[in-house]
Curated annotation (Swiss-Prot):
Keyword Aminoacyl-tRNA synthetase in annotation: yes
Protein name per the record: Proline--tRNA ligase
EC number: 6.1.1.15
SMART domains in UniProt: ProRS-C_1 (SM00946)
Gene name per UniProt: proS
Length: 493
């Protein structure tokens, strides 16, 4: 049974199938009856909740508050900002009617043609338009600024090719929308939130990221600048893991949102928006997991420790239960989340396989001999190693181990990125090396034409212009024209 539970397609055989197998078998999510939409199962949602809780704390620490805005957006709102509507038009789900009626043939229900909406409603693909229409009523003076709002919501983008967590027609996310009196304040906010995302990715997800600015071709529709964090997955593909946009005055002008400054002069408000989504779940899975299942960083694991009793009879189980209760109390007192699995419908071997598959960072196993010796077996998921340790001070042992696992997972991912990041100077070398995957740093002349040619010929895109990258000027690898710095290329999800 344990073997059957864990049978995953090896990554070396098919990375895509391995990912699909893992999401399903680890009970994270499954496909639904609605094309392109997923059911996030309790274990998967528990991970998302931990992400959500931590990010929400970080937002509030930087002065943000939560609000909620409508799911439906009048179609005319989307037309106000030309670049914005062009960027999202092909992905919009549109509500045209508000009522069903019984089918005259007696077979189910049909759309009532008499219930057509005067103006169609868009199911939000993102909320800039509805929020800036609202902000118009909130802002009159510089005293009303800044507004620092975040929203936790679902959005719909009618994707044609979907994959669980990575690209679905409906997904969960947070979107921050802020309003400022000056350009400098708004730019500072956009960069601040990029730092929040980078800190979360590295310190909680244990996922190293490159911070940078998107090229004009890759920029968010309607933004002046898009800041991004880019991560490298184990198959050598990049994953955009969070974006923060400096919107300038574009949306304020589209919705006529002005304010009176300290001198009484009226000006348009400056704006940002920023967001991460359940796509981070896909990033987490692909950054660390292996052919045995999930590998979760302790800071985001639904439970950090599982205790499995090994016994031959009810008397032994009762004794282990008593000792386990003491261990659980000690661990919880240290802020460590723990599950005790003394269910009798599965054998210990099956449980070991299940918790390995689910990526529980630390497994404790206790049998009759451990009771006699005051010991316990401790196994770590990241290295698949185990040892027997004394029970005295077990909470300190486990706390230290969890810290070490968090650091080790990050270091392993960082080492992978370093080993798969190269610098090239010629387009011929670029075309050869991009086939191996990974990040490539190369010079680019800054034109959309060159960027589009590279994408068409190699399927690689500019992931970002790194903020802390190699600032040595050079010549574009394609055209030979001057280039101020190297940019980051990769094939991407």
């Amino acid at each position: 049974m344990a073997k059957e539970l864990k049978e995953l397609t090896p990554r070396s055989e098919s990375y895509s199938q391995w990912y699909q197998d893992l999401v399903i078998k680890a009970d994270l999510a499954e496909n639904s009856a609605v094309r392109g939409c997923m059911v996030i199962k309790p274990y998967g949602y528990a991970i998302w909740e931990k992400m959500q809780r931590q990010l929400d704390d970080m937002f509030k620490e930087t002065g943000h508050v939560n609000a909620y805005f409508p799911l439906f957006i009048p179609k005319s709102f989307l037309s106000r900002e030309a670049e914005h509507v062009e960027g999202f038009a092909k992905e919009c789900a549109v509500v045209t009617h508000y009522r069903l009626k019984a089918n005259p043939d007696g077979d189910g229900v049909v759309v009532d043609p008499q219930a057509k909406l005067e103006e169609e409603l868009i199911v939000r693909p993102t909320s800039e338009t509805i929020i800036w229409n609202t902000y118009k009523n909130w802002i009159q003076s510089h005293r009303d600024l800044p507004i620092l709002c975040n929203q936790w919501a679902n959005v719909v983008r009618w994707e044609m090719r979907t994959r669980l967590f990575l690209r679905t027609a409906e997904f969960l996310w947070q979107e921050g929308h802020t309003a400022h009196a000056t350009k400098e304040e708004a730019e500072e906010e956009a960069r601040r939130m990029l730092e929040v995302y980078a800190t979360f990715a590295e310190e909680y997800m244990a996922m190293p990221v490159v911070k940078g600015v998107k090229s004009a071709n890759e920029r968010f529709a309607g933004a002046v600048d898009t800041y991004t964090i880019e991560a490298l997955m184990q198959d050598g593909k990049a994953l955009q893991s969070g974006t923060s946009h400096f919107l300038g005055q574009n949306f304020a002008k589209a919705f006529n949102v002005t304010f009176a400054d300290k001198d009484g002069n009226r000006d348009f408000v400056w704006a940002t928006s920023w967001g991460v989504s359940t796509r981070l779940m896909g990033a987490l899975i692909m950054s660390h997991s292996d052919d045995n299942g999930l590998v979760l960083p302790p800071k985001l694991a639904p439970y950090q420790v599982v205790i499995v009793p090994i016994y031959r009879n009810e008397e032994q189980l009762a004794q282990i239960d008593e000792k386990a209760t003491q261990i659980i109390q000690a661990l919880r007192a240290k802020g460590i989340s723990v599950k005790y699995d003394n269910s009798d419908n599965k054998k210990p071997g099956w449980k070991f396989a299940e918790y390995e598959l689910k990526g529980v960072p630390v497994r404790l196993a206790m049998g009759a001999r451990d009771l006699e010796n005051n010991t316990i077996e401790i196994a770590r998921r990241d290295t698949l190693t185990k040892e027997t340790v004394g029970l005295d001070g077990i909470e300190e042992t486990v706390a230290t181990l969890l810290d070490d696992i968090q650091k080790n997972i990050f270091q392993k991912a960082l080492n992978y990125r370093k080993e798969h990041t190269i610098t090239v100077d010629s387009y011929e070398e670029f075309k050869e090396k991009i086939e191996d995957g990974g990040f490539i740093l190369a010079h680019w002349d800054g034109t959309s034409e060159t960027e589009e040619r590279i994408k068409a010929e190699t399927k690689a895109t500019i992931r970002c212009i790194p903020l802390n990258g190699d600032m040595t000027p050079g010549k574009c690898m394609v055209t030979g024209k001057p280039s101020p710095q190297r940019v980051l290329f990769a094939r991407a999800y």
